[in-house]
């Protein structure tokens, strides 16, 4: 499995984008308007714009990073490749 970029010392938004042919999957760890940590996932096709999404509230930043790790393993098992965002590197 590819190594995920380390989170910055001060917790803040972390986003990952996975691609496979014409499919994409993104996962973003950030605070919402109620100051709760959430993992927002979205997926779909780059061809027709169809897709979906889900928001999961997590207990804290560390729990969110753990969930991102689980998501990354699952995406790689399905053939997706992680694209590193420069903001996370």
Region roles according to the model:
Residues 1-38:
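Short N-terminal "domain-start" leader segments
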Residues 10-12, 22, 47, 51-54, ...:
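A near-ubiquitous, low-amplitude feature marking generic local secondary-structure context
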Residues 1-4, 8, 78-89:
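Boundary/linker segments flanking structured domains
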Residues 67-74, 78:
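Conserved short hydrophobic interaction patches
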Residues 28-55, 69, 81, 85-87:
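Short aromatic-glycine-(Arg/Gly/Cys) micro-motifs in beta-strand/loop hairpins
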Residues 60-68:
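Short amphipathic alpha-helices within nucleic acid-binding modules
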């Amino acid at each position: 499995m590819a190594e995920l970029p380390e989170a910055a010392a001060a917790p803040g938004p972390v986003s990952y984008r996975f691609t496979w042919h014409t499919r994409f999957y993104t996962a973003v760890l950030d605070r919402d308007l109620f100051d709760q940590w959430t993992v927002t996932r979205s997926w779909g096709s780059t061809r027709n714009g169809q897709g979906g999404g889900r928001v999961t509230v997590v207990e804290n930043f560390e729990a969110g990073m753990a969930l991102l790790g689980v998501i990354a393993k699952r995406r790689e098992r399905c053939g997706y490749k992680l694209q590193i965002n420069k903001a996370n590197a």
